[in-house]
């Protein structure tokens, strides 16, 4: 798949001129290993991100929190994203159909979408892709616990009472 991606860009650059030429963006090339369980990844690992940026944030959702995984009887595994200043810099999935689930994170990284942007997408229920939304929901709930948000809500409630 990487060779196909590279070939597409080479062909485009051969036949088009600036500003229509493109550079290869290796940070968004996914990979998957079709083992039992499947493993898929895009971008930086947690260790690579810490080395590059220092302060990062990881958010993880387990497959045993996903109703479709329960229906399939495959609840082992997780999805994890790595954020640097709210930007998705990596994602890893271990579990059922990880190679297919990674694409939502590839798209987000390619187009600089935030986790909040991904969370706004409507996901069919019950599907394994709801694990992406579960990560977004965890981030939203964490944001609600921040001192700034709690202070804002306290002022808001005080205003209306």
Can you say where each PLM-predicted feature lies in the sequence?
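Rossmann-like dinucleotide/flavin-binding elements
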Residues: 1-26, 127
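Flexible, glycine-rich terminal cap/loop adjacent to redox cofactors
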Residues: 15-18, 29, 34-45, 50-161
């Amino acid at each position: 798949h990487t060779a196909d991606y590279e070939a597409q860009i080479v062909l485009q650059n051969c036949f088009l001129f600036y500003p229509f030429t493109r550079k290869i963006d290796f940070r968004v090339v996914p990979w998957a290993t079709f083992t039992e369980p499947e493993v898929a990844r895009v971008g930086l690992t947690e260790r690579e991100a810490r080395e590059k940026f220092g302060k990062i944030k990881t958010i993880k959702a387990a497959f045993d929190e996903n109703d479709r995984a329960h229906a399939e009887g495959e609840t082992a595994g997780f999805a994890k994203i790595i954020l640097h200043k709210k930007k998705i810099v990596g994602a890893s999935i271990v579990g059922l159909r990880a190679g297919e689930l990674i694409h939502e994170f590839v798209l987000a990284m390619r187009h600089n979408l935030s986790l909040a942007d991904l969370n706004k997408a409507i996901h069919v229920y019950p599907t394994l892709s709801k694990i992406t939304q579960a990560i977004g929901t965890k981030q939203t709930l964490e944001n609600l616990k921040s001192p700034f948000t709690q202070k804002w809500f306290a002022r808001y409630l005080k205003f209306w009472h």
